[in-house]
């Protein structure tokens, strides 16, 4: 089974506001960078989009190590998701799960892979995380340019 390391990050200027996501996939000496942005979004949605797009890029089942600076993503997928599903996509206090559309998508995408989820401190000099952060900020700029072009 192919091994892939993923570094993901999201960025948001205003929350909600302009947002971007970035992800770096590394496997066997090959690297792939992906990024994108949205005009009106939240930081958590962009963090989720970064990992979703990483998994969408995988063409076959892989052993994946995901590094994220988002405790929301890391804890959500590792600790909270099973409970949300068991409760019909409700939190422990019976409120609807925020961003359930993205959580459902991520849940579907990871099922064919062996995945380990790792939290890293953001903006602490971790090279993979710093690259993902730079890509997420590129995504913000693309969203900004798209708005300006449409104005």
Curated annotation (Swiss-Prot):
Names of required cofactors: Mg(2+)
Primary subcellular site in the record, as a coarse category: cytoplasm
InterPro entries found in the cross-reference section: RNase_H (IPR050092), RNaseH-like_sf (IPR012337), RNaseH_domain (IPR002156), RNaseH_sf (IPR036397), RNaseHI (IPR022892)
GO BP annotations listed: DNA replication, removal of RNA primer
Residues holding Mg(2+) 2: 9, 133
Residues noted as binding Mg(2+) 1 in the record, renumbered to the chain: 9, 47, 69
Enzyme class: hydrolase
Residues of the RNase H type-1 domain: 1-141
Subcellular location: Cytoplasm
Keyword annotations from UniProtKB, A to Z: Cytoplasm, Endonuclease, Hydrolase, Magnesium, Metal-binding, Nuclease
EC number of the protein: 3.1.26.4
GO molecular function, one term: RNA-DNA hybrid ribonuclease activity
GO cellular component: cytoplasm
Entry's cofactor comment: Binds 1 Mg(2+) ion per subunit. May bind a second metal ion at a regulatory site, or after substrate binding.
Record's catalysed reaction(s): Endonucleolytic cleavage to 5'-phosphomonoester
Function: Endonuclease that specifically degrades the RNA of RNA-DNA hybrids.
Protein family per UniProt: Belongs to the RNase H family.
UniProt-listed HAMAP family: RNase_H
Subunit structure: Monomer.
This protein's name: Ribonuclease H
